[in-house]
Every structure is written in C-alpha cells, then in structure tokens.
Amino acid sequence: MAVASSTRPSQKQSTSKLQPWIQLTRVRKFAGTMVLFWPFAWGLTMAARALLLPVQTFGTILACGFFASCLLHSAGCIWNDILDQDFDRQVERTKSRPIASGAISNTGALIFMFAHLFILMGMIWTSNSLAWMIGIISIFPLPGIYPLMKRITYWPQAWLGIALNTGIVMAWAYTTGTYPTSSIVLSVGAWAWTIYYDTIYACQDKKDDINAGVKSTALLFGSYIKPVLSLFGSIIVGSLLISGILNNQELPYFLVSVGGGGLHLATQLWQVDLDTPKSCWNAFHSTAFNFGAIVWAGLLLDYAWAVGVGAIM
C-alpha cells in the first residue's frame, strides 16, 4: 500500500503536465477533426462506388484518412493558437488556452506542431504526384494562412472552406490519379458547408470579436445571418444533388444524403438561437457529427448497393 500511495502524487503531476498539451491539440473537441474527415470520407466513398473499389482497400484508405484528419486538425489548432494568442487573451472563451495563458511556450508549441506535420508528410510520401501535390498544399499553405485572414477580411470562413475540404479531391487523386467534375461540384458544396457551420460557430464570440478586432462572417452578415445561411444551405444541397448525378449515384444516396442532409440543415437553422453561445455550439457540434454522418451514410449505402451487400458484410 505504501508503494501504491507513493506513486499517486507523481502520477497526478505527470497528468497535470500533459493537460496543456492535450488541450492544445483539441483532441477532446472532436468536432474539428470530423469536419476535416467527412469531406475525405465523402470523396473516397464516391470514388469507391465509381471504381467498385475492394472493401479492404476502401477501409484501409479510410482509416488512414481519419488518422491524418486527427493530425492535421491538431497541427492547425496549434498554429492558430500561436498566431492568435494576443486575440485569445481578449476573448472569454479562449483566454485560458495553453499558449495564451503561458502554460506552453511558442518554441514548445512549434516543435510539437512540426512533429505532427512530419508524420503527415510521411503518410503521403509514396502517393502519386497529384495526390502528393494536393497533400502538401493541404498541410502547409492553406491551413497556415487561415489565422491571418481573420485580421484582413470578414470572409475568413471562405478561406477555411478551401483549407478544410481538399480531402474530397485528395481522395479521388489518391485512388485514381485524377479528379472528376463531380468532385469539384461536391467541393463547392463542402465549401458552402464550412461557411455555414463556422459562421454559426463564430456567433459564440461576436461581442468579444468586435472588441478584439477579429473579423468573421458572423459579424459581416449581421442581422441577416439566417437568410444568408439558408442560401449557403441551398448551395450545399444543390451540390450534393448535382455531384450525385454526375457520379451516377443511385436511390440510397439521393434519399439519405441529399434528402436527409437537406432536412437536417433546414431543421437546424430553424432551431438555432444565434444570440445564445450554447445554442451555437450545439448547432456546430450537430452539423460536425450528424450532417457529415448523414451524407456519408447515403454514400456508404450506395457503395454497398453497387458492390453488393455481401461484399460489405
């Protein structure tokens, strides 16, 4: 008993030292990983259906994509916190973040971030030239520039929409060495989806952002947020419809992904209170998990329909 009790303080101390690093990577806030992963999963499943990709190959690539999404999300959060630390100290929701609070130094954060990036580069090292190029762009310039956009434009979400959704064309490029028109159309919808959910997310901090000088579509759209977001919702559903037609998707996709996804967005936009931070967070969390899953479920059912349910089971 004496040995066990003597180890408890050191265990607690080790855990407390790890907490800032865990907080820095946002591994406990999985919604950010999912909004990176879903576009890749959508693109891959569309490609798998078109190519009749073997289930084992599909599953392996999907798992790698999920792991890469976890790493890229964490690296992006670290970089964002390094650049935004002065802003974060002025916003109630973010002032306790590890870099803003001084729990982690800039040097330590940079080393940690580059460790993530080196693993990501290793994962795409043997891919074809197009997938390699898209992967490098997805890892470095696109997410790297995003935090700066909040300083110079009220449309940072538009840039974020490009940065977070390259997974669609990446999935096609990795499996086929090219990307079809359907993947571009779906990417437009995913871009609109990012503006949709990140505008809702930004509504949590509207008052603090005004004081800190942070720009966002939540401030730009003002009292017209819901009408504007309904327009972006229409773009999302329209792109799902058109990309499905171009990719020769069948009934399961149109019923679940297009119909179910559209119903989810409409219901969510009707219910969310954009002046209540908790309601905004719940809506963001819902679209990050539920909308993405609904769209993927339709794609997965259609893939099973194409290759034969027996192959999936």
Curated annotation (Swiss-Prot):
Residue numbers binding Mg(2+): D84, D88, D205, D209
Motif (YxxxK): 205-209
Compartment list: Membrane
Membrane topology term: Multi-pass membrane protein
Cofactor: Mg(2+)
Annotated phenotype, changing N80A: Completely loses the catalytic activity
Consequence recorded when altering D84A: Completely loses the catalytic activity
Single annotated GO MF: 4-hydroxybenzoate polyprenyltransferase activity
Function: Prenyltransferase; part of the gene cluster that mediates the biosynthesis of clavilactone A, a meroterpenoid that features a unique benzo-fused ten-membered carbocyclic ring unit with an alpha,beta-epoxy-gamma-lactone moiety, forming an intriguing 10/5/3 tricyclic nested skeleton. ClaR, ClaS and ClaT are sufficient to produce clavilactone A. Within the pathway, claS acts as an atypical UbiA prenyltransferase that transfers geranyl pyrophosphate (GPP) to hydroquinone (HYQ) instead of p-hydroxybenzoic acid (PHB), producing the first intermediate geranylhydroquinone.
Protein name: UbiA prenyltransferase claS
Organism: Ampulloclitocybe clavipes (Club foot)
